[in-house]
Amino acid sequence: MGIIAGIIKFIKGLIEKFTGK
């Protein structure tokens, strides 16, 4: 759960970086 949650958080961060210009 910890690793998966970390990956999801990381991907969400990248998406916000690209979408929240």
UniProtKB/Swiss-Prot annotation:
Q: Which domain of life is it from?
A: Bacteria
The gene name reads psmA2
The reply on keyword Transmembrane helix is no
Q: Which species does the entry assign this protein to?
A: Staphylococcus aureus (strain MW2)
Residue list for modification N-formylmethionine: 1
What's the miscellaneous note?
Answer: Peptide production is higher in most prevalent community-associated MRSA strains than in hospital-associated MRSA strains.
Q: Which InterPro entries match?
A: PSM_alpha
Please give the Pfam families that the UniProt record associates with this protein. Answer: PSMalpha
Q: Give the induction text.
A: Up-regulated by agr.
Q: Any idea which UniProt keywords this protein has?
A: Cytolysis, Formylation, Virulence
Family note: Belongs to the phenol-soluble modulin alpha peptides family.
Q: What protein does this entry describe? A: Phenol-soluble modulin alpha 2 peptide
* Gene Ontology biological-process annotations: killing of cells of another organism
Job of this protein: Peptide which can recruit, activate and subsequently lyse human neutrophils, thus eliminating the main cellular defense against infection. Stimulates the secretion of the chemotactic factor interleukin-8 (IL-8). The ensuing activation process triggers an inflammatory response in the host, thus contributing greatly to virulence. Also possesses hemolytic activity, which may contribute to the development of disease.
